[in-house]
From Swiss-Prot:
Signal peptide span: 1-17
Protein name per the record: Carboxypeptidase Y homolog ARB_07161
Cellular component terms (Gene Ontology): extracellular region; fungal-type vacuole
Top-level taxon of origin: Eukaryota
Pfam families (UniProt xref): Peptidase_S10 (PF00450)
SUPFAM superfamilies, per database record: alpha/beta-Hydrolases
Protein's UniProt keywords contain Disulfide bond: yes
Classification of source organism: Eukaryota, Fungi, Dikarya, Ascomycota, Pezizomycotina
Length: 486
């Protein structure tokens, strides 16, 4: 089995009624962990507002089961959950899946077989939306991809209609076929997570990363049980941004100050101040690593590092997602197309065609991102999970060379710092130029060893398939074919 890098993000929720309209939160409504987190936030962030960190559930209207083409109950599936090398009850009986066949002619996204629906966590009231597209080539043999967006708090529908899906949305809200869609040679599942992102919903928002894996495990178990025709192919998990999760803060000063391949954005005094803040930032992060359950410690560290190493760049007006230009549209994360996608998906005929139960779609949720920050999730050492993954799964980590927030210097650094048997050989290897397999132009630089590969993609920002669609499809297909995996 091969796999692209991703960390799974889904949160916890409480019991949920069939329909819900949100109301404002007050401090007296917070209990347990939420109250602990809010106390930590107030202590570290003067003037913090409750609504910035704890959002009510997304408004929704659940459709009756008979409106769906089918459903599958978890209790009909016999499986185990493996945790720390031990078999444990999977809890799959707590889940169910509702689905429908999407008529390709209804929206014109693509003419391939499509399914959409919801994974339902009956115990916690989570409902995660998915949209599946069959491969354009040979779905019987082509691999299956699970795509997860980052943020945290951005819908995978944004990547579907902006980057690697079968169609792109224009300013006029019309669709154009994407000739460089990743479903040219693979079937793709786009999953909206965590809860209250995109078309997913639940009574309580997501707070951190670790609660994700069981929900995604349940989704995949039920999906492949219901659609066994896709269960025998190679399977990959792919994602971007926060899906990769960890970027060393020490990489920000050199990237902003002319050492990442592009001209400096900041002046020398600011660069020196940022460099001077790196040791303290690293100390704060280590404190969080040493006490990962201490929310106040992790929040304090994340705030210090963000204030010292990210805000100086943000204040310039330059896009944190592409060092080559200004932020065109701050309300849509510097990408105007995100606003077009939201308008397209908020059309009633679109929502009806895919069975969406959330009437107001937002591409990215600042509330979700703030919640993850508030729970200290930003500084958690999840990259330490990668060595265990490398025992069984090949991992490709790619980064656009013009991205600031997840810059290639930092991504390369953490791949070289991983504690795994191939570390020393991987570190010693130099980056070598990769050429497009057909057009023969240089698309990036790569290094790889024993199942781990790092790829620096030329002339690309944060969203690589958006900036370099041909090159992204080329390296994606080559990875699927087994290149860079020895």
């Amino acid at each position: 089995m091969k796999g692209l890098l991703s960390l799974l993000l889904v949160g916890a929720a409480n019991a949920l009624a069939a329909s819900y309209e949100p109301r404002s939160l007050t401090e007296d409504m917070l209990q347990g962990k939420e109250k602990e987190v809010w106390d930590a936030i107030k202590g570290e962030i003067p003037g913090a507002q409750l609504d910035d960190y704890f959002n009510p559930p997304t408004a929704h209207q659940r459709e009756p089961d008979e409106k769906w083409d089918g459903k599958l109950e978890g209790k009909s599936v016999n499986t185990l959950w493996v945790e720390e090398g031990k078999d444990k009850p999977s809890g799959i009986e707590e889940y169910g899946m509702r689905f429908k066949t999407v008529d390709p002619s209804s929206l014109g996204v693509d003419n391939v077989t499509q399914y959409s629906g919801y994974l339902d966590n009956k115990k916690n009231g989570q409902h995660l939306f998915f949209w599946f597209f069959e491969s354009r080539r040979d779905p019987q043999y082509d691999p299956v991809i699970l795509w997860l967006n980052g943020g945290p708090g951005c819908s995978s529908m944004t990547s579907l209609f902006m980057e690697l899906g079968p169609a792109r949305v224009g300013q006029d809200l019309k669709l154009t076929r994407n000739p460089n869609s990743w479903n040219n040679r693979a079937s793709i599942i786009f999953l909206d997570q965590p809860v209250n992102v995109g078309f997913s919903y639940g009574k309580s928002g997501a707070f951190n990363t670790p609660s994700a894996s069981k929900d995604v495990f349940a989704f995949l178990t039920l999906f492949f049980k219901k659609f066994p025709q896709y269960a025998l192919q190679d399977f990959h998990i792919a994602g971007e941004s926060y899906a990769g999760h960890y970027i060393p803060f020490a990489s920000y000063p050199p990237m902003a100050c002319g050492k990442g391949g592009y001209s400096a954005v900041l002046d020398q005094p600011t660069c020196k101040a940022m460099e001077a803040a790196v040791p303290q930032c690293q100390k704060e992060i280590k404190r969080c690593y040493d006490k990962p359950t201490d929310v106040a410690t992790c929040v304090k560290g994340a705030k210090f590092c963000k204030d010292a190493l990210v805000r100086p760049y943000s204040r310039t007006g330059q896009s944190i997602y592409d060092i080559r230009g200004r932020c065109e549209d701050p309300k849509d994360l510097c990408y105007p197309i995100l606003g077009w996608i939201a308008k397209y998906l908020n059309q009633r005929h679109v929502q009806k065609a895919i069975g969406a139960e959330v009437s107001h779609f937002k591409g990215c949720s600042n509330h979700i991102s703030s919640q993850f920050f508030a729970h200290g999730d930003y500084n958690q050492p999840f990259h330490r999970k990668i060595p265990g993954i490398l025992k069984d799964v090949n991992v490709l980590v790619y980064a656009g060379d013009a991205d600031y927030i997840c810059n290639w210097l930092g991504v390369k650094e953490w791949t070289e710092a991983l504690q795994w048997p191939g570390r020393h050989i991987f570190r010693r290897k130099n980056l070598s130029v990769v050429y497009h397999s057909v057009n023969k132009w240089p698309l990036g630089r790569v290094k790889y060893h024993n199942g781990l590969a790092f790829l620096q993609v030329f002339k690309a920002g944060h969203r690589v398939p958006y900036d370099q669609p041909e090159n992204a499809l080329d390296f994606f297909n080559r990875w699927l074919a087994g290149e860079w995996t020895p």
